[in-house]
UniProtKB/Swiss-Prot annotation:
Cross-referenced InterPro entries: Cyt_c_bgen_Ccs1/CcsB/ResB, ResB-like_domain
GO cellular component: plasma membrane-derived thylakoid membrane
A Gene Ontology biological process term: cytochrome complex assembly
HAMAP family for the chain: CytC_Ccs1 (MF_01392)
Membrane-spanning intervals of the chain: 14-34, 72-92, 162-182
Name of protein: Cytochrome c biogenesis protein CcsB
């Protein structure tokens, strides 16, 4: 029993909870640094030759479950342990403290007043119901009072005592919601060309919806660096009687019937070429060996002797580079520019077709996450409200009225109010 009590004491301590929060923050940071959810081969190929931090190779990453941190056993155990710590702290400290603050504390002799933060006393005449007058004054000033025969207990701002408990509940909901989301959330990345669409099916309601990419554009800085990606999407559903257009941007996702659509990436998927008076739409693939965000395709050109040429592009505005695979010498093609003669073939660029990379995510934990944030913010705000307490004692033998006050926050502000009240009581 003693061992169990000591264990609860350690688990419910602030130091233990802070240690867990720091550990979760560090591991979450590692999770943003190490790609999550890829195949075992990916980690072996990428980290065996260049270990993370100099010692974490692919095998160690897999063994330590760093490839799926947020669903790993040790990470979930840490979340559960933090929930237990916060719950233990709430039951051991916050709830007893709240219960104690609900009780009216009696200060029925002058010796007790010396222990308070603020005290004052005034002589009174023998006649007059001073207790009732003070009680009425305090109620007018917004104080909750409890009147005894010879003394009064008063308090204000008790809601501030609830704040830490609300924050703890919010953190617990956040942790449980995050753990729930790591198992139940689903995401799918799709690349859509303008005019293309995809169907969404909600199995729980047996309803269907269609998302169509109306337009995709890229805003660039003056030096050509991408500034913003913008997808204009049409949402339609006969089952839900919906037909509306919404815009997705980076950091500005679209929320639709429990789904969140993020603007995540882009690509140049197709180019339209006119080769010897015939139009061809060629599909491009990313070529990381050449450079970051470079797309291309290998084509045969020539009216008599066919030769391979590599077409590459890295910008939705062009140019398209045509390179001879033998010596990689080449020329640039611009949209609607005059045709180039390549190996006796006339080639012109008619159109560049970029595609929008969208991540469609279904995360049932989002309402829990938002609710937890509301609780945490609300709890933090009301925690700032000071809890003030007053005691008034009338000693009929010495004909003296004593006033004492206590505040857990903003003692300077409470001190001004205390002595103002003291002067009003003195003038009775």
């Amino acid at each position: 029993m003693i061992i169990f009590k000591n264990l609860i004491l350690k688990i419910s301590s602030l130091r233990f909870a802070i240690s867990l929060i720091i550990f979760i923050a560090i591991t979450s940071g590692i999770g943003t640094f190490i790609p999550q959810g890829n195949s075992n081969k990916f980690y072996i190929d990428n980290f065996d030759s260049a270990p993370i931090f100099g010692f974490l190779d692919g095998e160690k990453v897999l063994k330590l479950q760093l490839d799926h941190i947020y669903t790993s056993i040790w990470f979930l155990f840490t979340l559960i342990l933090l929930c237990i710590s916060l719950s233990a702290c709430s039951f051991r400290r916050q709830i007893p403290s709240l219960k104690a603050s609900l009780k009216w504390i009696e200060y029925n002799n002058e010796k007790k007043f010396s222990k308070l933060q603020l005290t004052s006393s005034h002589p009174i005449n023998q006649d007059g119901d001073h207790i009732s007058k003070v009680d009425l004054l305090l109620k007018k000033r917004g104080w909750k009072t409890y009147k005894f025969k010879s003394h009064i207990s008063a308090r204000r701002g008790l809601i501030g005592k609830i704040g830490p408990l609300v924050v703890h509940i919010g953190l617990i909901v956040l942790l449980l919601g995050s753990a729930y989301g790591s198992f139940t959330s689903q995401s799918n990345e799709q690349y859509l060309l303008p005019g293309e669409s995809l169907d969404l099916v909600n199995e729980s309601t047996n309803s269907k919806a269609n998302i169509k990419l109306v337009n995709f554009s890229i805003e660039r800085e003056s030096d050509g660096i991408p500034k913003q990606f913008i997808s204009k999407l049409n949402f339609s559903s006969e089952d839900l009687n919906i037909n509306e257009i919404k815009t997705a941007k980076v950091n500005h996702p679209i929320r639709f019937k429990g789904l969140t659509i993020y603007q995540a990436d882009w690509a140049i998927s197709n180019v339209v070429l006119e080769i010897d008076n015939i139009l061809y739409q060629l599909q491009l693939k990313e070529i990381p060996e050449i450079g970051n965000q470079v797309w291309g395709v290998l084509v045969e050109l020539g009216s008599e002797t066919k030769k391979n040429f590599l077409l590459t592009i890295d910008n939705e505005n062009g140019p398209l580079k045509i390179s001879n695979v033998e010596n990689f010498s080449g020329n640039n093609l611009y949209i609607n520019d005059r045709p180039l003669e390549v190996n006796s073939s006339k080639v012109s660029l008619k159109k560049i077709i970029p595609s929008s990379g969208l991540i469609i995510k279904n995360d049932p934990s989002i309402p829990f996450i938002y609710f937890s944030f509301i609780l945490i913010i609300f709890g933090t705000i009301i925690s700032l409200i000071p809890t003030n307490q007053l005691w008034i004692f009338v000693n009929k033998e010495s004909h003296k009225l004593s006033i004492g006050g206590l505040s857990n926050k903003n003692l300077v502000g409470f001190k001004k109010e205390f002595f103002k009240l003291s002067e009003e009581i003195k003038n009775f």
